[in-house]
Amino acid sequence: MILVDMNQISVASVMMHLHMTKQTKPDEDMVRHMILNSLRMYRMRFCDEYGELVLCYDSKHYWRRDYYPEYKHNRKKGRESSANDWDAIFAVLNAVKSELKEFFPYKHLEVYGAEADDIIAALCGELEFDNGKTLILSGDKDFIQLQKYRNVTQYSPITKKFVNGVDPDDYLSEHVLKG
């Protein structure tokens, strides 16, 4: 199973497009093309070894905000100070997400209150004793801790490399201590 952190793939596609075009508002057709092409490329590269793609999305509401209202507050402040048209960006990403869900054969997971990270972590734990391999498609280093499961590997679309070389338990301990 290939667990795709779709928020990272989607936002990276938009940011690359805006950077290359020097625009602040995305071209929906180009962003759609970039996202679909990325998914096609990863499917072709990894499906024989890992199986089907499962697109994992963040919910609009995070349960962590119920307990810590400042959760990811700096991202919001960063968007407010950005020249990019974030309303247009989110409109394009939501349109592409709806199209992927309605017209494409990929499994689509979005759980109210959960982030894609939560979904991916839960699936890795559930699939630990499955005979298949699990690939996490994300550059988020927090996923290193999930490599404690014998069948989990991670590939970063950003660096275009497998993420490894760090002991998952040491990584988790270090980040707990750092806060």
Please identify what each model-predicted range represents.
Residues 1-98:
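Domain-level signal for Mg2+-assisted phosphodiester chemistry and nucleotide/NA-binding surfaces
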Residues 49-50, 77-179:
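Extended two-metal-dependent nuclease catalytic cores across DNA- and RNA-processing enzymes
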